[in-house]
Amino acid sequence: MTHQAPVPPSEKESFGERLQKALSARGPLCVGIDPHASLLLRWGLPDSVDGLRSFADTVVSALADRVAVMKPQSAFFERFGAAGVSVLESTIRQARQAGTIVILDAKRGDIGSTVQAYAQAYLSPTSPIAADAVTVSPYLGFGSLAPVIDEAEAHGGGVFVLALTSNPEGPSVQHARTSDGRTVAQTIIDEAAACNAKAPVLGSVGLVVGATVGDTGHDLSALNGPVLVPGLGAQGGAADDMRGLFRDLRGVVVPSYSREVLSHGPGKSGLRDAADRALSACQKALF
């Protein structure tokens, strides 16, 4: 992976435009920041706030000026309480300053003033925990996400909506049929596409589609937005799986690796080499 200059955010650019530029400049790769207790142990770090901080600082220092996207998993920071959230704030801030796009993996979903508060927490520029984009759950109805989508639009942020997840329990809900014959997942896909319909380049409302879902027959062709693809590497998905799944979506797919890269720490060169291998595999599969 060759070093690329940072991709600075611009208030005049939408999230979709910034993401597309980052993927073009640095290649189609997102690296998750998932400080599992087992990973901390593997790195020789204590399962504590100090271990969490050392882990996150090392990953950001090694990769944030090289990869297009990084994705901290909020839960692994939250488990340490306020001190862990403080580390998360610092991690997001440092990663963004280094030029990578940060998607906060929080999977929040609620209604009314509560979801509005989540939107302000994760997407308002005045929030200490603000990221470039956030993952959300639509299972209180897609319309419940309106405050998050509005907040994102107001500040040039992005939203990634869970659509087709790779956990075995997912299909019982996501593949269920609605009254008009579409699956629940297809209604989510179509609602996201409607949000992006007027975007001049790439819309800022994306979807989360697991790498291991297989060919489900869902139609993403009208999305005009990015697709975040977790589940690659240690979770069982392979880069080659994306060839069939996303054959009509080249250039907007954001493949995400976590343990497959993170397990090669704590040395920075090991992390960089693993990220290089993951990026090479994704480029071969998507181009």
Identify the role of each PLM range:
Residues 34-38, 75-77, 107-111, 137-139, ...:
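Active-site beta-loop-alpha junctions enriched in small/polar residues
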Residues 79-94, 111-116, 140-153, 212-220, ...:
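Active-site-adjacent beta->alpha loops and helix N-cap segments on the catalytic face
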Residues 207, 211-256, 260-261:
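A C-terminal functional module that forms or caps the active site or interfaces directly
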Residues 37, 106-206:
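Conserved anion-binding
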Residues 23-24, 60-66, 92-97, 149-155, ...:
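Acidic (Asp/Glu)-rich catalytic clusters
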Residues 31, 70, 105, 134, ...:
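Conserved, mostly hydrophobic/aromatic
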Residues 25-29, 65-68, 98-100, 130-132, ...:
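Short, well-ordered coil/turn segments that N-cap beta-strands
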Residues 3-72, 77-90, 94-103, 180, ...:
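Conserved N-terminal beta1-alpha1 strand-loop-helix module at the mouth
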